[in-house]
Amino acid sequence: MYYSLEKVVSLIGARRFGNSEAKIKWLLTDSRSLAFPETTLFFALRTRRGDGHKYINDLYRRGVRNFVVGKCPDDMEQNYPHANFLLVVSPLKALQRLAERHRDEYNIPVIGV
């Protein structure tokens, strides 16, 4: 299933920087797991051990153009001219909210094990 970037923006309550059209199929939180950069949305998560924001440059070079961030890069317009940055207070909360909204679209029982 694909989501338009506009739909993602509305679902997570983000402020969008960038005007490139995008369809999102894959959500990414670990830059080592990148498979389909053209349709990937990267969530720059901050943890005790790392900060996903430091992988934006590498992912951009590898073809990712859509990022959910807690802070936009200072050199955003110069170094990432074809990127879309979705600015939120917490990328983790945005990921959780998107997962919740996606789940709400289906009327399928959830089974926990």
Where are these regions (language model features)?
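N-terminal leader/targeting and accessory segments in enzymes
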Residues: 1-97
